[in-house]
Curated annotation (Swiss-Prot):
Matches recorded under InterPro entries: Ribosomal_mL41
Predominant cellular place of this UniProt entry's protein: mitochondrion
Name of the protein in question: Large ribosomal subunit protein mL41
Gene label: mrpl41
A GO MF label: structural constituent of ribosome
Cellular component per GO, a single term: ribonucleoprotein complex
Subunit structure: Component of the mitochondrial ribosome large subunit (39S) which comprises a 16S rRNA and about 50 distinct proteins.
Keyword Mitochondrion: yes
Function comment: Component of the mitochondrial ribosome large subunit. Also involved in apoptosis and cell cycle.
Keywords: Apoptosis, Cell cycle, Mitochondrion, Ribonucleoprotein, Ribosomal protein, Transit peptide
Organism, as annotated: Danio rerio (Zebrafish)
GO biological process, alphabetically ordered: apoptotic process; translation
């Protein structure tokens, strides 16, 4: 920056607002490139050398045949599906597995961890189902 441009900047009303934005003016975490990471290095001769390992690679899935749209309008009506309850979740996920094991004859009350259940809730901060356990 030249001397004349610095002097001209000083005469302008609001000279502090006209100052060049540098890392000295921003917070401690301010980086001049606004969050973009460098993709290479600058040599002593001020030449930029890109480094392939520093360039991010994006893995984009194949969306061929994908039916959902990328945008959902705010004008869409509210959903009609009821909110998920623990009983509904149990009936949809765990109950069919237990019923299948009973039909096959391999169900055991000692092996409830197989279905994602816990034998006791000792040591838990919150008792999830207090009706099922003696107080």
């Amino acid at each position: 920056m030249g001397v004349l441009s610095a002097l001209a900047r000083g005469f302008v009303r609001g000279a502090d607002r006209m100052a060049e934005w540098t890392s000295k003016r921003g917070p401690r975490t301010f980086y001049k490139s606004r969050g973009a990471r460098p993709t290479g290095i600058v040599t002593s001769s001020r030449k930029f050398i890109p480094i392939r390992a520093m360039i991010p690679e994006f893995a984009v899935p194949n969306l061929e045949g994908f039916n959902l749209k990328a945008y959902v309008s705010y004008k869409t009506p509210a959903g009609t599906e009821e909110p998920m309850t623990p009983e509904k979740l149990f009936n949809e996920v765990v109950a069919p597995q237990i019923q299948r094991d009973i039909e096959e004859g391999v169900f055991s009350e000692d092996n409830l961890e197989k279905y994602g259940l816990e034998k006791t809730q000792e040591g838990k901060l919150f008792k999830l189902h207090p009706k099922n356990f003696a107080r």
